[in-house]
Curated annotation (Swiss-Prot):
Substrate binds at R7, K8, S96, Q97, R98, Q160. Keywords: Cytoplasm, Flavoprotein, FMN, Isomerase, Isoprene biosynthesis, Magnesium, Metal-binding, NADP. Belongs to the IPP isomerase type 2 family. This is Isopentenyl-diphosphate delta-isomerase. InterPro entries: Aldolase_TIM, FMN-dep_DH, IPdP_isomerase. The gene is fni. GO terms for cellular component: cytoplasm. Transmembrane segments: none annotated. Its cofactor is FMN; NADPH; Mg(2+). Involved in the biosynthesis of isoprenoids. Catalyzes the 1,3-allylic rearrangement of the homoallylic substrate isopentenyl (IPP) to its allylic isomer, dimethylallyl diphosphate (DMAPP). It is an enzyme of class 5 (isomerase). Mg(2+) binds at E161. It comes from the Bacteria. GO terms for molecular function: FMN binding; isopentenyl-diphosphate delta-isomerase activity; magnesium ion binding; NADPH binding; oxidoreductase activity.
Length: 339
């Protein structure tokens, strides 16, 4: 089994069967408290939860965020996620396509996933550090074409790589690679973190590089320091991974920083968002979409219906937050009053 494939299996085992969450740090949404509106002047049953993102209309402002399915179970997991996304009318991002491109393994990331995710946006995914390597920029368009994607996620994950055995430790030139990427792909480029967050300063550099959208993927949910520590056999790195378990910028902080500087930049909030109320708070802080990965992974290992049930519960809670703030449309949450 290839090293990358084995690592993906370890990731899956860690997230599904062990507590890989941050210990003390949260995503920061407890600091946002809506003011209750006793005269909402809207009908609960007709509240509009639909939204538009990068030119696509979505029934709900949700994204099935990029996640690893592991080599053994990737195809089943990705197919269930795609089926659920299509049924719900929400967007879906696939996990890293590095293995499928470099080792000729589909891992559920071929044309089938496009057929299952019919009628909804589907996003490709590659690591920024790998794109910097000579000759690898062309992999971006290959990744898009492999699944007929509507946009390309490029994940920036330096701290995860630092804790990873044989990870990409040299990040010199990564921003330049991102700048060079724009003319090589025919879809929008979305930069995302993996759970450590993107600051306002880094967002500015990314905007200057020409990216189309950002997924803040902030701290507060799964700790990828902890996950990589679990996968390590080096005791020094294991200890260091535990020390840095809570490293990162809370998701709410990322949103506030970036939205203040870029009022119109398409933003995705992910990282430590567990329910529809927290999704409402993320939208209030400026998110256009709300993504979940770890929170829905276990459901995806069981059935498509459980994934659908999960997001329908999220939608109910989001609708309640809209009603309680007098927001007839989900986008009106940006103007909801706070205590």
């Amino acid at each position: 089994m290839a090293p990358q494939t084995n690592r993906k299996d370890l990731h899956l085992d860690a997230v599904l069967h062990h507590d890989m969450s941050m210990k003390k740090k949260t995503a920061g949404f407890e600091s946002v408290e809506f003011e209750h509106c006793a005269l909402p002047e809207c009908d609960f049953n007709t509240i509009d939860l639909s939204t538009e993102f990068l030119g696509h209309r979505l029934a709900l402002p949700f994204l099935i965020s990029s996640m690893t399915g592991g080599a053994r179970d990737a195809e089943t997991i990705n197919c269930r996620l795609a089926e659920a996304a299509s049924e719900l009318g929400i967007a879906m991002g696939v996990g890293s396509q590095r293995i499928s491109l470099e080792e000729s393994q589909h891992s559920g990331l071929g044309k089938t996933i496009r057929e299952l995710a019919k009628g909804v946006p589907l996003y490709s995914n590659l690591g920024a550090a790998q794109l910097r390597d000579k000759g690898k920029l062309d992999n971006a368009q290959r990744a898009v074409e492999a699944i007929q994607a509507d946009a390309l996620f490029v994940h920036v994950n330096p701290m995860q790589e630092a804790f990873q055995k044989n990870g990409d430790h040299n990040w010199i030139g990564v921003l330049h690679a991102i700048e060079q990427l724009k003319p090589r792909v025919n879809v929008p480029i979305i930069i995302k973190e993996v759970g450590f967050g993107i600051s306002g300063d880094v967002a500015q550099r990314l905007v200057d590089a020409g990216v189309d959208a950002i997924d803040v993927a902030g701290a507060g949910g799964t700790s990828w320091s902890a996950v990589e520590g679990y996968c390590q056999d080096n005791p020094h790195m294991q200890r260091a991974a535990e020390l840095f378990r809570d490293w990162g910028i809370p998701t709410a902080t990322c949103l506030a920083q970036i939205r203040a500087q870029h009022p119109k930049l398409p933003l995705i909030a992910s990282g430590g968002i567990h329910n529809g109320l927290e999704a409402a708070k993320a939208i209030h802080l400026g998110a256009n979409l709300v993504g979940q990965a770890g929170a829905v992974l276990k459901a995806a290992t069981i059935s498509t219906q459980l994934v659908v049930d999960h997001f329908e519960q999220m939608a109910l809670e989001l609708r309640l937050a809209c009603f309680g703030t007098g927001s007839a449309k989900v986008n009106a949450l940006t103007k909801a009053r706070r205590l």
